[in-house]
């Protein structure tokens, strides 16, 4: 929550800390008109197309049918457009990635793209774009930025919605200066890493619960009398 609030404050409202640690725009920071974006942005900022800021790994995606997944049950998450669909016995990605729904359910109730942050060993099907920033130091900014794009600006189709590579990569984004991006990552990344550790601990405990509960139910395991 804090990461999203800080993103909105700094990169949407433009009230990042200035040289005097005061909110930039609210304190009269210089704003200039950007013709490509058709809006005012802070004086030292610029713009770019998303294709110049991110790398896509869609060519490495491999879809598996439900029948195939049934034959390959395992421990590695199998991701679709909106979340984990199954667990399989192999993986094609290992590390931190950002997923953005490509088709089917492409946006949430508020009209923003469905974006997931994943890490570890996993498998991703062909219904989610797989993304990292060209400078992987800016992963947290990229995650929040993608979540803030109005989906209607990159979607096509009236009934069956789709976010194509072309539309995604052609999106025109505000590009903050690198110093501010570094500051954002320095604040947010430690919080995110702590959150990841908590999620991993919860998942480990849930797995232990699921393994022990049937044994307790049928008397194969005894509770510690202490």
What do the predicted segments below correspond to?
Residues 63-64, 83-86, 115:
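Glycine-rich, charged/polar anion/phosphate-binding loops
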Residues 37, 84-86, 105:
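Short beta-turn/strand-loop junction motif enriched in small, turn-promoting residues
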Residues 80-82, 91-147, 152-171:
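A short beta-sheet element
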Residues 1-6, 26-63, 68-80, 174, ...:
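Non-catalytic DNA-recognition/assembly elements of restriction-modification systems
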């Amino acid at each position: 929550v804090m990461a999203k609030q800080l993103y909105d404050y700094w990169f949407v409202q433009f009230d990042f800390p200035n040289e005097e640690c005061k909110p930039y725009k609210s304190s009269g920071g210089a704003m200039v008109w950007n013709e490509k974006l058709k809006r005012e942005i802070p004086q030292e900022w610029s713009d770019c197309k998303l294709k110049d800021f991110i790398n896509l790994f869609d060519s490495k995606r491999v879809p598996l049918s439900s029948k195939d997944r049934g034959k390959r049950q395992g421990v590695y998450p199998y991701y679709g457009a909106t979340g984990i669909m199954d667990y399989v016995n192999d993986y094609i990605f290992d590390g931190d990635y950002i997923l953005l729904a490509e088709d089917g359910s492409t946006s949430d109730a508020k009209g923003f793209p469905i974006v997931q942050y994943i890490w570890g060993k996993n498998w991703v099907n062909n219904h989610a774009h797989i993304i990292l920033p060209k400078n992987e130091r800016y992963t947290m900014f990229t995650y929040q930025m993608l979540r803030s794009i109005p989906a209607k600006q990159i979607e096509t189709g009236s009934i069956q919605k789709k976010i194509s590579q072309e539309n995604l990569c052609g999106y025109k984004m505000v590009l903050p200066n690198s110093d501010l991006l570094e500051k954002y990552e320095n604040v947010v990344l430690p919080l995110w890493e702590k959150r990841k550790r908590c999620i991993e601990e919860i998942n480990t405990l849930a797995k232990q619960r699921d393994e022990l509960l049937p044994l307790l139910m049928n008397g194969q395991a005894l509770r510690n009398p202490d």
